Structures are given as structure tokens and as C-alpha cells.
Amino acid sequence: KGKVETILSAAGNIKLIFYSKEDCQKIVKEFPKSIMEIAPGITISQAVVKMEGDYAEFHNAVDELEKRLRVQRNRPMPSLTTGLMGIKRSNKTGLPAKEIKEGDYLDDATKAKRKCSDNSKLCEKAFGEALLAKQFPFNIGDITSHNDWIAIIHADGNGLGQIVQKVGKNKDDFKEFSNKLEQATCKAAQEAWNAMEDDIKQCYPIPLRPVVLGGDDLTVICRADFAIEYVETFMKNFETQTENLLGDILTQHKVFDNGEKKLTACAGVAFIKSSYPFYYGYELAESLCGKAKKDAKKQNSSLAPSCVMFHKVQDSFVEDYDKIAEREFKPNKDVSFEFGPYYVQDNIKDKPTIKHLLESVEKLNSEDGNKIKTHLRQWLTDLHEDKAIAEQKRKRVLSLLPDGELKELFKETTDMSNPKKTMAYDMLALASIKYQKTK
């Protein structure tokens, strides 16, 4: 009965202004129940701020709203699907079974996910067109090609918190910013897909499955061999599209001291086998994205440059990235195999670029390149045992290799003088993902 104004509705985030207390109370009471009935298992966090007194100004109300939401997220919500003892449960989720289909006991959440087969809107956002359902991969195994590796990509815009603080002082500007940010992210994803090779785009089913695309977030599952190229193109286009669509808003509100008119993004890529649990792969991708952001902020605290971290999961251990790095990337206290993140731009001092990484990996895809891969693997093994022996063998290999770009690549990659890190581990991991055939 009263007016309701939508300020933001994207990526699981909704902000509304109510001009009627009764309408607000009705939504707060009924909205969580309606969502959990449609999508069992989803949890809803809500908060309300009355725009008066200290919170009369829109930006102050939004700041307080975010604080209250953080409190609500830390409060456990009772499950509506625990069920009673003695009833049959889904073998996969442990929740009460509501249906048997093809021998599988399905709980409410699984039933809802399987029934939600219309992915046309998500396809249109990710690819620019609503693809036919039969073109869309539903089984992760259908995404793979010459080997069993898939990639989970999670990308996230940089510095949105500080940007919203400046833009969010005016609700109309904040609404426009949110809508155009959504457009920029979707267009960047579409351009990234359009830039892929024709043999990738013409695969059946499509070897890329969008999971989340909205706001400044992107999460996709894709075939592993083109994941780095895809995410590099996405980040480049995210910068371009945000400059085109948001440049005037960023300038008007003097968001960046240097007058920057674009946004940037960081990404994490988890390379996993198709049989590896998606949840753990996603957690790793999110952790890698956070690692990339942390390094990028050191380069420019105002607007962190776009970059990506990736990791190839080689075992069945389920642990966070820092523990993986400590276990796998530190052969001794003086050496690290952790060379990333890899940056989009080439003007970041002493930081590797995605372009250089991909060019280096491409050089390994030849008969002579295979010999270099063998030398690099042996050198990495020697580093675990004795750094001095590894250096002796390195010099011997260099003395035997003919002059050329492969010799220069080996020399550059194994030079541990400064910093005491090597790109060899990442190169070999990515080369095996892109070129190794196991099926």
C-alpha cells in the first residue's frame, strides 16, 4: 500500500527503502519464509534502519545497515529441513528425503535445484544470449576434454567498500552505480567468452558453466585449459567496461585521488579434478582471490591492480591455501615456489604478468620444450634436497643447451638471485593442465 524503492538487487544483495512501516514489517516477516520454500537450504540475513536522527542521511543509514547485517550473519538460523529420527535421508546431503528419482533419495534442496533447469537468464548474462538447455553442462564431467582437469574461477571487484562510501551518499547515484556495475560485470563476462577460440565456443555442451554473475562478482566452472586466458580477458574488459559505464560517476564523486575512472578486479583459479568436491574447490578459489587482493593492495592501496592467483590441487588434502603453500611451496627456508599473483598490466615493478606466464608455457609445448620441462622438474626436485647441488646442475644444463629462447627461458626461470622465487612450479602445473592428454 506504500511506495517501495529498490536501491540494489544483485548478487544476493537487496536494499530497499520503504515509505510505509507496515510494508517493511510485512516483508521482513514473510520474505525469508518465501525464499526458503522456493530454495530450501538458503539462509537469509535481514536488518532494518529507520532513516531518522543520526541515520536521516542515506549514506549514514547504509553504513549502519551494513553493521547490523554483519551481526545478523553471525547469528545461527534454525534449519527447517532437519527432520525427525527414523526417516529416510538423502545419501549425498544427509537431509530428509522427499522423493525417489532413478534410485536416488532426494531432499528438498536437491529437488529444487534439479527442477530449476531454466538457466536462460544466467546464460544471457554470461554469454550474451539465452542458450538452449541442451547446450548447458549439468554434469561437471561433461566440461572436461583431453584430461580430467576443470577450473573454478572466482573474480571480485577491488575496493568496492571505499567506493560505495563516497558514491553511496546519494541514493540515486548509488542506485545508478549499482545498476551500471552489474552491466559492466556482465559485459566483461560476455567479452571474455566471445574472445575464446572458435573450437571452444562450438563445443557441445559448452565447456563453461556460470555459477554466480552479478554486482562485481563472477564465479564460473570451466574446462581447465582456457581458464587463465578467460580470466585475463574478463579482468581487462572489467576495467574497460567500468570506465565506459562508471567513469563519470567515479569522477563526479572524486572516488580516486589520482582521477582514475575505472575499477579493477582480482581473481582466484582453483584447478581441480572433475571428481573433486566443488565446495572445497570454490573455497580454494575464493581464498586465492583474497591472496591476490592482498598482494595487489601493496602495489596500490587506492586502486589495487588486476591480478590472478591459481593453484593446481595435486592431492586429496582439504585445507586452506596458506597451509597448502607452506607444505608444497617451501622446499627450504630460502626458496619459494609461490611466484604469483600474475598481473594484467606490465607496469607493476618486479611483478610477473599473465601474458609472460602464458607465453612461457606455450614455449614448453614442443619437442625441445619437453626437454626443458624435464630439466625444470629435476631442478625443482634438487632444490628440495640441496640448493647448492641444484645450482651446480643448473649451470651444467645451461652449458649444454643451445642458444635460443628456450635456453633463455630456463635461465630466467631458474635464476634464484633476487627474489628467491621461481615461476617453474607454476609453468609446469599450467603446461600439464593445458597440454597433457590422459583420455
Where are these regions (language model features)?
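Regulatory and interdomain segments flanking nucleotide-handling catalytic cores
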Residues: 1-439
